[in-house]
Amino acid sequence: MPTISKEEIERALDAWAEHLLLTPVVQSGAPLAVVGIVSHGDVLARRLVNRLEKAGCQALYGAIDITLYRDDLDLRGSRPAQRSSHLPFSTDDLYLVLTDDVLSTGRTARAALEVLWEYGRPAKVEFHCLVDRGGRQLPIQPDYAAFNLTVTPEQSVRVRLHEIDGAEDITF
């Protein structure tokens, strides 16, 4: 099973933060928020905000739970555990970077956008992910993907992050 190492993930996060720092919106000094989708996307968002702040760029951090906005709740049989969102600011007029670990069908990103509208009207929203594995079912594409993998629908992509999983790698 192919693996992307912790070191490769760290280098990818450095490049991701550098990409954000070089965007015209950030260069202009516009207010920036990095919001992660619980549970791995919020860890990535926190890491990105830390990198941005070390580079002198102020960025708000937030996390959203999309559980109640999923379009497959009726298909799952049991109700999945809901976690809390942490978005202690209005998103009005912000440049908002929505982050997640893996982009596949696009359904999670769609649900996340729906949650965001409840917190205000951002000036701009971009979707960034650690891994784009393809397999879209909705017309959603990432504005930035650290890794683009070519996998079949049957193959799984597993992201482990130290803060949640106690280990760090991507296997596929």
Model-based region annotation:
Residues 1-172:
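PRPP-associated nucleotide enzymes
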